Amino acid sequence: SPPVHPPPHEKPPIVHPPPHEKPPLFEPPFEKPPPAHPPPVHPPPHEKPPIEYPPPHTKPPIEYPPPHVKPPIQYPPPHEKPPIEYPLPHEKPPVYEPPYEKPPPVHPPPHEKPPIEYSPPHEKPPVHEPPYEKPPLVHPPPHDKPPIEYHPPHEKPPIEYPPPHEKPPIEYPPPHEKPPIEYPPPHEKPPVYEPPYEKPPPVHPPPDEKPPIEYPPPLEKPPVHEPPYEKPPPAQPPPHDKPPIEYPPPHEKPPVYEPPYERSPPVHPPSHEKPPFVYPPPHEKSPMHEPPYEKAPPVHLPPHEKPPIEYAPPHEKPPVEYPPPHVKPPVEYPSPAEKPPTHEKPPIEFPPHEKPPVYEPPYEKPPSVCPPPHEKPPHHEKRSALYPPHHRKPPNHHKPLPYKKPPFYKSPPVEKPSSYESQPYGRLPVLPEK
């Protein structure tokens, strides 16, 4: 029995991935591994089993496909690839194990090297010490020289300061002379821009002359429809003709278009004159429309007389129709009045005999069933593990302690610092005192 246990532990992992293909295919290989691998499986089970199982997987599929003909040949190829991929990752883990053994020996050597590096720098500092001995020898001689140099420089600066003060005033005036020379030329240029300002004004009027040339032609067409309307207002247009004659002369060229402008003004007055002429005729025709209004009232009167004549006949008909139906209901009511007594008799006779015996038995059953469940709620006792639910809790013979009202808790006085007096959200709440 002990040697049999290891092989089954190795088989299940192999059975899980390829059970979807063909469970019976993997049964024969299960018989071969137990006798051959039991002893070596224990020490290196993780290294050898994955390497040995791929070959048996490749052989069985090659033997079984021929009997199944084509369908099995199509399914195994895609399923054969995953099993080939699984063993490869199992082979890689052992490859990573040896490199883990190498890093530990790598760490000690670097720790040995740093101490070797620190020793040489400690030897170099003493090399820098001799040059520190030389500078002190260099410093004393310069200390001897500076005192000799300080005296002459104090004598020279006063001689040097006056000349520089004389030069700056000489330099400032020339730049001041140049700006005035530059400003006049720009002043000469502005007058050059003035003449062009005189030219644009004459440019603007010509465009003003062109629009009037465009507007008159459309105005010439309406006067074609106005000839018959020019006759009635001969008195009013003459005064209106004079103002338009005054406006064109300032434009110099408009006088050429004066004739069309004379026609345009009469266009507006006649239009204003048209409404007055149009309004009177309708007022004159209003009497023509009035007669129809006079006819309308007499037309309404007769209909008012007719409706009463028309309403009367319909009112006469309904009463003639309603009485016959009303006559029938009274004939029907007496018959039902006689039937109720017949309906009342059966309920009085049958139900009283049937109901009393039916209600008696149920009333006897509830009292026997209900009392036990109703005993539990009134007690309101918590169930305990020591006593069954149908037993009462053992009585407590100790006398209950007298109830004493607890004293009211009075918080100690709060000493507010000066910073608490002005709070943005108002004063702090105060507990009530009793």
From Swiss-Prot:
Record field: compositional bias (Pro residues): 25-43, 51-77, 95-108, 192-205, 256-269, 320-339, 358-372
Sequence ranges of Basic residues compositional bias: 389-402
Chain segments carrying region Disordered: 1-434
This protein's UniProt keywords: Nodulation, Repeat
InterPro entries: Proline-rich_CW_protein
Region (36 X 8 AA approximate repeats of P-P-P-H-E-K-P-P): 6-407
Residue ranges, compositional bias (Basic and acidic residues): 7-24, 78-94, 109-132, 141-191, 239-255, 282-293, 302-319, 340-357
GO terms classed as biological process: nodulation
Statement: the UniProt record of this protein carries the keyword Repeat: yes
Role description: Involved in early stages of root nodule development.
Similarity remark: Belongs to the nodulin 75 family.
PANTHER family assigned to the protein according to its UniProt record, in alphabetical order: PROLINE-RICH EXTENSIN-LIKE PROTEIN EPR1, REPETITIVE PROLINE-RICH CELL WALL PROTEIN 3
Listed name of the protein: Early nodulin-75
Organism: Lupinus luteus
Lineage per the UniProt record: Eukaryota, Viridiplantae, Streptophyta, Embryophyta, Tracheophyta
